[in-house]
């Protein structure tokens, strides 16, 4: 309302100013230049009395939206694909409606945004909110949490390098230990970091909580986790119980997640890297004065003082840490997502190759080949070494599944037409005859679904099946023709003389197929 009043005041000022300048002897062109408006606007103000001006400003014309007829189509697509952009909607509208009016991009964006607000369709799907509960403190010496991290640092000459680290925290006292490495953690290096931590603590806890990290787990095995050989041997030797969180659930070990974040933001930020031994020494000093020496935020206790009590409950560690031998080597990833090693090709997940400079870390251990991501240091995959030559060894899930996505699209079409037998047969024939273009044809049909009911789509597919036509564009064209035909029939009512004859309909179908190059 305030905006409307301000707008009226500005117009009223303009009306009075135009007349004031006219009385001073200025013509329409001069008034327009002075006020920055067109001379036609000046003429309109001069020809309008005060009563006419007030009446015009008081009347509110309601304009019909140019794209109003397409609101339900846009709504249906936004509800199914809430992440879709206005530009993509514009393209679909032009594709499904040949007579779609020419409008600018801003008009489309505004219309799509209006539909989103009207029906409450956000761009991001709301995620499920998790309920939290504060857990009681665990007994001394029972639990610890461990995790891995990495961060880029600057050297003295300004070069950027990445360092990797292992972090472990005792759950009760919050007493921490960190160990840095210049290479990603494999199983051997992870075991060595555990041994250093046990030596630092002077003992070990009964249980340690981890992510389901490939460095420690060989296979998930439907919940019966199978540990890597070296880590399994280490667990048996030290007699502690490893506890693994659910996949993608880092919040179940929040204490060590906070430690990793604390190391990155407090210890590593703005620190110059000299060498890894110096970095580990600096980390020990930082733990003494800050990481373990300052009061913990939630317990309001100092971890170093709490650890004096927890140390008595730890199982004594009498071993000697042994540094693992064998350095990782950097290997180039081929464009077919494989690495060549000793005359064989070992696969990586589809999409690993990102250009000619893509590399991974390679490490051979215990008859296995481990490949690590160069950027994150995470274990990408593990292969058994092949003694033959010239073989390609594929990992589970590394080969592209070509038909799974298309099958899901076909299922959506069948659900829409209530599993009509003719549509199912047409889709089956389409897949057999045009396997390479099967998905593209399905996508065309899915895009027209919001614009036509299932009866129209079923009729169009039935005609194509009868004529042996297997092309999504032909189905789309037929749907448009059938829809227009039904609209004409609804307009003329039941007048037999105005109905399209069947021979004319067949001729129209043939013209559609000919235009698509199918007859």
Curated annotation (Swiss-Prot):
UniProt keyword DNA-binding present: yes
Annotated SUPFAM superfamilies: Ribonuclease H-like (SSF53098)
Record keyword Secreted present: no
Pfam families (alphabetical): Mu-transpos_C_2 (PF22483)
Molecular function in Gene Ontology: DNA binding
Segments forming domain Integrase catalytic: 135-311
Matching InterPro entries: HTH_IS21_transposase_type (IPR017894), Integrase_cat-core (IPR001584), IstA-like_C (IPR054353), RNaseH-like_sf (IPR012337), RNaseH_sf (IPR036397)
UniProtKB keywords: DNA recombination, DNA-binding, Transposable element, Transposition
Biological process (GO), any one: DNA recombination
Occurrences of domain HTH IS21-type (ranges): 13-78
Record-stated family: Belongs to the transposase IS21/IS408/IS1162 family.
PANTHER family hit by this protein: TRANSPOSASE, TRANSPOSASE RV3428C-RELATED
Biological role stated in the UniProt entry: Involved in the transposition of the insertion sequence.
Protein name, per record: Transposase for insertion sequence element IS21-like
Source species: Bacteroides fragilis (strain YCH46)
Gene field: tnpA
């Amino acid at each position: 309302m305030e905006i409307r009043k301000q707008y009226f005041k500005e117009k009223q000022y303009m009306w009075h100013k135009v007349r004031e300048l006219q009385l001073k002897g200025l013509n329409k062109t001069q008034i327009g230049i002075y006020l920055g408006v067109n001379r036609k606007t000046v003429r309109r103000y001069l020809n309008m009395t005060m009563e006419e001006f007030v009446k015009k400003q008081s009347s509110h014309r309601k304009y019909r939206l140019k794209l109003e007829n397409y609101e339900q189509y846009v709504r249906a697509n936004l509800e199914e694909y809430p992440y879709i952009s206005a530009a993509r909607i514009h393209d679909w509208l032009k594709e499904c409606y040949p007579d779609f009016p020419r409008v600018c991009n801003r008009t489309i964006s505004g219309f799509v945004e209006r539909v989103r607000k009207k029906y409450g369709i956000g761009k991001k799907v709301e995620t499920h909110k998790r309920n939290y509960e504060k857990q009681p403190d665990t007994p001394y010496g029972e639990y610890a949490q461990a995790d891995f991290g990495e961060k880029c640092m600057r050297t003295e000459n300004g070069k950027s390098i990445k360092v990797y680290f292992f972090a472990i925290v005792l759950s009760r006292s919050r007493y921490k230990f960190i160990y840095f490495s210049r290479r990603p953690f494999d199983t051997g290096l992870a075991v060595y970091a555990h041994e250093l931590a046990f030596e630092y603590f002077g003992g070990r806890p009964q249980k340690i909580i981890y992510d389901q990290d490939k460095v420690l787990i060989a296979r998930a095995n439907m919940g019966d986790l199978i540990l890597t050989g070296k880590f399994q041997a280490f667990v048996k030797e030290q007699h502690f119980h490893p506890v693994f969180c659910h996949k993608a659930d880092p919040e179940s070990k929040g204490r060590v997640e906070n430690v990793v974040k604390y190391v990155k933001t407090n210890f590593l930020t703005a620190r110059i890297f000299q060498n890894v031994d110096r970095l580990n020494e600096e980390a020990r000093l930082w733990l003494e004065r800050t990481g373990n020496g300052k009061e913990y935020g939630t317990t309001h206790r100092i971890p170093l003082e709490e650890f004096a009590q927890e140390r008595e409950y730890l199982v004594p560690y009498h071993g000697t840490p042994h540094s693992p031998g064998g350095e990782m080597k950097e290997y180039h990833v081929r464009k077919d997502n494989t690495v060549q090693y000793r005359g064989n090709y070992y696969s990586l997940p589809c999409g690993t190759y990102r250009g000619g400079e893509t590399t991974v870390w390679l490490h051979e251990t215990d008859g296995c080949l481990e490949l690590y991501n160069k950027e994150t240091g995470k274990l990408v995959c593990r292969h058994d070494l092949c003694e033959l030559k010239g073989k390609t060894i594929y990992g589970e899930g590394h080969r592209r599944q070509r038909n799974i996505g298309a099958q899901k699209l076909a299922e959506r079409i069948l659900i829409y037409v209530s599993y009509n037998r003719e549509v199912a047969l047409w889709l089956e024939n389409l897949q057999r005859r045009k396997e390479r273009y099967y998905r593209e044809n399905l996508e065309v049909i899915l895009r027209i679904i919001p614009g036509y009911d299932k009866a129209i789509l079923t009729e169009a597919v039935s005609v194509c099946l009868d004529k042996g036509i297997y092309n999504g564009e032909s189905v789309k064209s037929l749907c448009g023709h059938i829809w227009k035909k039904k609209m004409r029939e609804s307009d003329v009512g039941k007048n037999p003389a105005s109905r399209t004859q069947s021979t004319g309909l067949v001729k129209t179908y043939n013209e559609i197929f000919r235009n698509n190059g199918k007859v």
